[in-house]
From Swiss-Prot:
Highest taxon of source: Eukaryota
Record PTM Phenylalanine amide, positions in chain: F74, F88
The name this protein goes by in its record: Preprofallaxidin-7
Region span, Disordered: 25-47
Cleavable signal peptide: 1-22
Biased composition, class Acidic residues, residue ranges: 30-42
InterPro entries: Frog_antimicrobial_propeptide
Leucine amide, modified sites: L62
Alphabetical UniProt keywords: Amidation, Amphibian defense peptide, Secreted, Signal
GO biological process: defense response
Family to which this protein belongs: Belongs to the frog skin active peptide (FSAP) family. Brevinin subfamily.
Length: 132
């Protein structure tokens, strides 16, 4: 009888241990499956959220542009052009009043169509270069 009790408890213990191990594996598999489904759902949600943010960003930019057009119908840069048809700046001032750019080199070109210099004078009077 004692040996029967021992064998019965041994079988019962081993059976319960194996059952608990099987249940743990099932739970792990179910958790993995749920995590996989959850990841897919979260990816879909992320995609929708990103798309919504993108649409909202575009709409806000369009709203800003329409406000700018309301207050600046020609744009900030074109406001200058509205009052100053010629671009206003240091370089453009020279072009506005002096059609030929002013500078040491350009002054020579303005009054002397042929460049003046030691080498160019030789070419002017002597077509064949003369060297020393």
């Amino acid at each position: 009888m004692a040996s029967l009790k021992k064998s019965f408890f041994l079988v019962l213990f081993l059976g319960l241990v194996s059952l608990s191990m099987c249940e743990e594996k099932k739970r792990e598999n179910e958790d993995d499956a749920e995590d996989g489904n959850h990841e897919e759902e979260s990816e879909e949600k992320r995609g929708l959220v990103d798309f919504a943010k993108h649409v909202i960003g575009i709409a806000s930019k369009l709203g800003k542009r329409s406000e700018e057009k309301r207050y600046h119908p020609f744009g900030k840069r074109s406001e200058e052009k509205r009052y100053f048809p010629i671009p206003f700046g240091k370089r453009s001032e020279e072009k506005r009043y002096f059609p030929i750019p002013i500078g040491k080199r350009s002054e020579e070109k303005r009054y002397f169509p042929i460049p003046i210099g030691k080498r160019s004078e030789e070419k002017r009077y002597f077509p064949i270069p003369i060297g020393k």
